[in-house]
């Protein structure tokens, strides 16, 4: 999941992660919105949630998925609400850290500060998912 305003950094991380996951028996889930999520769809998400009520969709995704991976998100990003749903259900939230000067890194850096698991190397995440 991630920002609707995807950076080149976010695009690269998503591409690298999707490439690592393509031969694993892991279902990739996303929400149909622009930005990072549309890149996940383009690269092969297996399940796509849709609708206009993002609070309801976020709850459905949190019920369905085992973990949440957030690549980017700005201040006030909907990914913060989604992360809250996962945390409320006792599920792990993984975040890609970013530069503190980048608005698109605010949500991930803040969530890491609040206890989300930082993704320092993508290969380590794929080990956790097996």
Predicted regions: what is each one?
Residues 1-130:
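Glycine-biased, small-residue-rich flexible motifs in mid-sequence functional cores and linkers
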């Amino acid at each position: 999941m991630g920002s609707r305003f995807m950076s080149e950094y976010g695009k690269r991380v998503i591409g690298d992660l999707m490439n690592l996951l393509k031969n694993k028996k892991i279902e990739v889930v996303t929400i149909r919105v622009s930005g990072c999520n549309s890149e996940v769809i383009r690269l092969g998400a297996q399940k796509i949630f849709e609708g206009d009520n993002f609070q309801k969709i976020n709850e459905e995704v949190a019920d369905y998925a085992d973990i949440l991976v957030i690549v980017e998100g700005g201040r006030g990003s909907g990914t913060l609400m989604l992360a809250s749903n996962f945390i409320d259900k006792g599920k792990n939230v993984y975040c890609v850290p970013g530069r503190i000067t980048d608005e698109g890194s605010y949500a991930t850096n803040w969530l890491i500060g609040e206890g989300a698991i930082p993704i320092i190397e993508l290969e380590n995440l794929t080990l956790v998912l097996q």
